[in-house]
Amino acid sequence: MAAGAAAALAFLNQESRARAGGVGGLRVPAPVTMDSFFFGCELSGHTRSFTFKVEEEDDTEHVLALNMLCLTEGATDECNVVEVVARDHDNQEIAVPVANLRLSCQPMLSVDDFQLQPPVTFRLKSGSGPVRITGRHQIVCINNDLSEEESDDESEEDEIKLCGILPAKKHRGRP
């Protein structure tokens, strides 16, 4: 009877962990940490381009999420075309105009979390600016290391053996 109760308890423990994603071939997702920092640069007649680069690190992904491009103090009423130079899905360099700003009709443009993978270069293709580009630099780190506690839990689970279900004994002489 005690062996049956222990087996049932082990089974329930294993099932509750499986529902949480930790047993039976299912893995708990690796812990993810995310940091977010303000980003800003200014393009003008003196500084016509800016390149956003990051150092390559293991298990770290960088995302530049643009929020707004706007003309700042000192801008004249001319067309200011800003283009982004980045890599496409084939890893080929591609230049795409993202904003055409003019002081009298469209002095700013909200791009609502437009995400880019570094390295990214911003160029003032035409006009003299100054154009301010703002956004967020997001750093996502995935930690694939298992803690000692998780490793111990896995070794305990390997040791647990479930007893097979035996048919009930029938008593003769009882209806």
UniProtKB/Swiss-Prot annotation:
The keyword Acetylation applies. Predominantly expressed in testis. Gene3D superfamilies: Nucleoplasmin core domain. Keywords: Acetylation, Chaperone, Methylation, Nucleus, Phosphoprotein. GO terms for biological process: rRNA processing; rRNA transcription. InterPro entries: Nucleoplasmin (IPR004301), Nucleoplasmin_core_dom (IPR024057), Nucleoplasmin_core_dom_sf (IPR036824). GO terms for cellular component: actin cytoskeleton; cytosol; nucleolus. The modification N-acetylalanine is found at residue 2. The modification Omega-N-methylarginine is found at residue 27. It holds the Pfam family Nucleoplasmin. Its main location: nucleus. It is found in: Nucleus; Nucleus, Nucleolus. The modification Phosphoserine is found at residues 16, 147, 151. Phosphorylated. PANTHER family: NUCLEOPLASMIN, NUCLEOPLASMIN-3. Plays a role in the regulation of diverse cellular processes such as ribosome biogenesis, chromatin remodeling or protein chaperoning. Modulates the histone chaperone function and the RNA-binding activity of nucleolar phosphoprotein B23/NPM. Efficiently mediates chromatin remodeling when included in a pentamer containing NPM3 and NPM. Belongs to the nucleoplasmin family. Interacts with NPM (via N-terminus). Forms a pentamer with NPM at a ratio 4:1 (NPM3/NPM). Two pentamers form a decamer. This is Nucleoplasmin-3. The gene is Npm3.
